[in-house]
C-alpha cells in the first residue's frame, strides 16, 4: 500500500511554503520555495560552519576598512553579512529571500528607501538580481509609504508586523508585493488577556488572516498574503490555501511527519464578507489607536527587531575587537 502524502506535501499543493530561517542545512533538507532572514537568524547563522568563510571574509574587510568611525564600520559589516547570508540562501531556493531593513528606521520613510536601494545594489554586485529578493519593512505608515515608492522602482517589498486591518489595507493600496500578518503574536496577546479561543476557527490570528485574505481576493488585490509567526501546526492547517505561509523548521518537520487529509481552507473563489474602505494616514492612525493589540504588538515587534539588530552589531563589534 502506498503511504499517504505528508501534510507538508499536501500543503505545498495549496500554498507556497516559505522557511522562516537562515539555517542552510534546514533549507536544503526541507526545500521551501522562499526563505526569510532577520538579524536574529543572521546572528544564529554565523555560528554555522557553512558561513565560516563568509564571516571571516567580512571581518577581514571590516578590520581593513576600520578607520576612526568604528560604529560605521560595524554597521557596514552587519549589512555585508546580512547580504552574504542572503546570497548563499538565494542559491538554495527557487524563489525569493526576504531581507530586513533596519528596524530602527521604521518611522523614517526616506532612510528606509535609501537602505532598501543599498541592499538591492549590494545583492546585484554579488550576482543576485532584485527579482530574487524581497525587502522586508515594518508596516508603519512611514514604512508603507517607503514601500509604495520602492514598488514603483521595481523593488518588491515584504511588509511585516501586520496585526491590524488598516495596516493590511494600506499595504494593498500601496501595491505592496507581499504582507506578513503575524498569527501567533496575535494569539499570544489574547491568551495573555485570559481569552483563549475555544477552537482553531476562533483563534484571533487565524480569523485575522482569513479576513485579510478574503478582503484582498474580493478587492482583486495582487498583494500576496503570507501568514507568519505560527505557534502550532493547527494554525497552519487552518490557513491551508493562503497565498504563502512562512514556517519555522520545527513546525515544517512536524508537518512532514504527519499524515491524514489536509483540506483547503482558503481559496479566491470562496472569498466573502470583506468590505474595502480607502486608507489614508489619518484613518491608518485611528485604526491602530482603536486596536490596543495591534498598537502594542507593532511597537514591541519593532523594538524586538531593533534589539536583535543591535545584538548582531555587538557580536560583530566584539569579533572585530578580538
Swiss-Prot record:
One of its GO terms (biological process) is pentose-phosphate shunt. CDD domains: Transaldolase_TalAB (cd00957). It is an enzyme of class 2 (transferase). The keyword Translocase does not apply. The keyword Kinase does not apply. It catalyses: D-sedoheptulose 7-phosphate + D-glyceraldehyde 3-phosphate = D-erythrose 4-phosphate + beta-D-fructose 6-phosphate. It holds the Pfam family TAL_FSA. The active site is at residue 136. Pathway: Carbohydrate degradation; pentose phosphate pathway; D-glyceraldehyde 3-phosphate and beta-D-fructose 6-phosphate from D-ribose 5-phosphate and D-xylulose 5-phosphate (non-oxidative stage): step 2/3. Keywords: Cytoplasm, Pentose shunt, Schiff base, Transferase. One of its GO terms (cellular component) is cytosol. SUPFAM superfamilies: Aldolase. Its EC number is 2.2.1.2. It is found in: Cytoplasm. InterPro entries: Aldolase_TIM, TAL/FSA, Transaldolase_1, Transaldolase_AS. One of its GO terms (molecular function) is transaldolase activity. Gene3D superfamilies: Aldolase class I (3.20.20.70). Belongs to the transaldolase family. Type 1 subfamily. Transaldolase is important for the balance of metabolites in the pentose-phosphate pathway. Homodimer. This is Transaldolase. It comes from Xanthomonas oryzae pv. oryzae (strain KACC10331 / KXO85). The gene is tal.
